[in-house]
């Protein structure tokens, strides 16, 4: 094999909106409320190996806005990307898939959620940046804690993508 074939390779094949739903269970009455809504945001990352060097990474976001105890809206969205990743050592692969890929996808998710919220007739909500490295490290610590409690060795098995 030539040196070119053994070079680390990272390529975004596709970025796409995999799923989105918006619910407004209390419309139109909720538009008459004067109080500011409370907003709750949840974000999750999942990754699947589709082929030897091809991964699908999905960043999911859920935004729930409530006025008092009434739901103004609930939006759930999944922004996905297909990444071609080759010649990367296993110990670097999980962080690449768990940190770099979600960091690439999140601005798309944030934009799609903000657009859906304003199109639904609500004031814009701009999601803050997310430190995916901290999220990854937190998830890794949880896995190590679970593995320790189960009597297994610490860390994710080699080649396992953290979900």
From Swiss-Prot:
InterPro entries (alphabetical): SecB, SecB-like_sf
Q: Which PANTHER family match?
A: PROTEIN-EXPORT PROTEIN SECB (PTHR36918:SF1), PTHR36918
Q: What is the lineage of its organism?
A: Bacteria, Pseudomonadati, Pseudomonadota, Betaproteobacteria, Burkholderiales
Can you state the subunit structure given in the record?
Homotetramer, a dimer of dimers. One homotetramer interacts with 1 SecA dimer.
Q: Which family does it belong to?
A: Belongs to the SecB family.
> Key word Metal-binding present in the record?
no
- Give the protein's biological function: One of the proteins required for the normal export of preproteins out of the cell cytoplasm. It is a molecular chaperone that binds to a subset of precursor proteins, maintaining them in a translocation-competent state. It also specifically binds to its receptor SecA.
Q: What is this protein called?
A: Protein-export protein SecB
- UniProt keyword annotations, A-Z: Chaperone, Cytoplasm, Protein transport, Translocation, Transport
* UniProt GO molecular function: unfolded protein binding
Quote the subcellular location field of this record. Answer: Cytoplasm
Output the Gene Ontology cellular-component terms.
Answer: cytoplasm
UniProt GO BP: protein folding; protein tetramerization; protein transport
Task: Give any Pfam family that matches.
Answer: SecB
